[in-house]
Amino acid sequence: MAWTAPKLREVNCGMEINMYAPAEDEGGRGTDPIL
């Protein structure tokens, strides 16, 4: 359980950046489920 918490956090961080990069690059379609 101790090593699962940080792993899930890393995935969340990566997904946030991944969704942010393409969303802003496309022209901000208005898809911000993380915000």
UniProtKB/Swiss-Prot annotation:
Q: Does the keyword Cell division apply?
A: no
Domain of life from the UniProt record: Bacteria
User: The cross-link Pyrroloquinoline quinone (Glu-Tyr): at which residues?
Assistant: E16-Y20
Q: What are its GO biological-process terms?
A: pyrroloquinoline quinone biosynthetic process
* Biochemical pathway: Cofactor biosynthesis; pyrroloquinoline quinone biosynthesis
Q: Per UniProt, which keywords does this protein have?
A: PQQ biosynthesis
Name the family: Belongs to the PqqA family.
Family matches, as NCBIfam families: PQQ_syn_pqqA
Role this protein plays: Required for coenzyme pyrroloquinoline quinone (PQQ) biosynthesis. PQQ is probably formed by cross-linking a specific glutamate to a specific tyrosine residue and excising these residues from the peptide.
What HAMAP family does this protein's entry cite? PQQ_syn_PqqA (MF_00656)
Q: What is this protein called?
A: Coenzyme PQQ synthesis protein A
The scientific name of the source species is: Ruegeria pomeroyi (strain ATCC 700808 / DSM 15171 / DSS-3) (Silicibacter pomeroyi)
Q: Gene name?
A: pqqA
